[in-house]
Amino acid sequence: MRALEENGVADNTLVIFTSDNGPGYCGSPGGLRGRKGQSYEGGFRVPMIAHWPKEITAKSICSEPAMNIDLFPTLLSLAGVDLPEDRVIDGKNILSLLTSNGKRDPSDCLFFYHNKELEAVRMGKWKYIRDIDTMAWPIPLDKHWKSENSLEAPWLYNLELDPGESYNLRREHPDIVEAMEAIFQKWQKSMKENLGGWK
C-alpha cells in the first residue's frame, strides 16, 4: 500500500485481501461450524477486504455471498478483457457487489467441494450438504473433527436463521431438499461430462 501511495496510484488501484478457506487445525472459525476440509460455513466462509478509494465507499459492508472463482471474471471485466469462449467459466462478475449495494442473483448457486468430491450446494439462504464423509481420515488430525452420523444425511440449513448450521431442516422442507438434490445432480453430471472445463 505504501508503494501505491508513494506512486500516486492508490486511489485508483483495487487491492483485495482474502483467504481460500477457514482455519485448519488451529485458529477459530469465529463461531461457525466446521473447519478447512469440511463443507460447513467454518470451512469456507472467510472475510474479503477490497480497497479502491475511487470506486468503493470506505467502511462499506457487503453481506452477499461470493467465491474466489468470481474474482477472475470480475478482474477481466475491469481490465476490459472479454471472458474466454473456449471454456466454461464458473465464476460471476461481482463488480456491483464491490462498488454499490448490488445483490447476487438469488438463483445463483455456490458449490462446495472437498478435493474432487462435490459435497454441498448453496442457493440463497439454503445450504444443502449431501456428503461430508470425504475427509474421514483413519486418524483425524484435527481434534475438533468428528464423524457425522450418516443416518442424518442429507443436511439442509437455513443460513439466515442458523449460520452455525445446528438444525437439520431436511424433514421440515422435503421440497427444498428435492430441489437442491436436483441442482446437485445436474451440476455433478455437467462436471463429469466436461472434466477439463473445455467446451
For the regions a language model picked out, list residue spans one by one.
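Secretory-pathway/luminal and periplasmic proteins that interact with or process carbohydrate-rich
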Residues: 22-28, 100-107, 192
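C-terminal, low-complexity/hydrophilic appendages and adjacent surface loops
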Residues: 36, 40-41, 112-170
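Metal-dependent active-site segment of extracytoplasmic phospho-/sulfohydrolases and closely related
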Residues: 1-29
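Structural recognition of the beta-strand scaffold that forms the well-ordered cores
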Residues: 14-18, 48-51, 73-77, 109-113, ...
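Loop/turn elements at helix/coil->beta-strand transitions in domains of secreted/extracellular proteins
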Residues: 9-15, 45, 105-108, 123-126, ...
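Non-transmembrane alpha-helical segments in soluble domains
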Residues: 1, 5, 72-76, 95, ...
